[in-house]
Amino acid sequence: MNNIIKMLNDEQMKTDVPDFGAGDTVVVQVRVKEGEKERLQAFEGLVIAKRNRGLHSAFTVRKISNGEGVERAFQTHSPLIASIEVKRRGRVRRAKLYYLRERSGKSARIREKLGTK
């Protein structure tokens, strides 16, 4: 039984997901269906949390829109996600950046990770 579930999960997992983590700035292209038409909507922001659970992996992206903080949670392997592009790597010392919710301006900045390790 477990082998069947594992096989189905592996079949549905995407292979083109880039390597990213908390602190990275990403652009997520989401498929949006409006009536009969379908279009791509870009959501660019900072990854504040990532949850790695195989097919059930998810991540949360936060951006500031018109002075208001907007967070959106995405399922990593969802068919509604067209692509994920990493714009900038951030250097952080925490796995979850929920403390950024209370901060604004210069105190909410994330240092950029330079070079590759």
Swiss-Prot record:
GO terms for molecular function: structural constituent of ribosome. Keywords: Ribonucleoprotein, Ribosomal protein. This is Large ribosomal subunit protein bL19. SUPFAM superfamilies: Translation proteins SH3-like domain (SSF50104). It comes from the Bacteria. GO terms for biological process: translation. This protein is located at the 30S-50S ribosomal subunit interface and may play a role in the structure and function of the aminoacyl-tRNA binding site. Pfam families: Ribosomal_L19. Transmembrane segments: none annotated. GO terms for cellular component: cytosolic large ribosomal subunit.
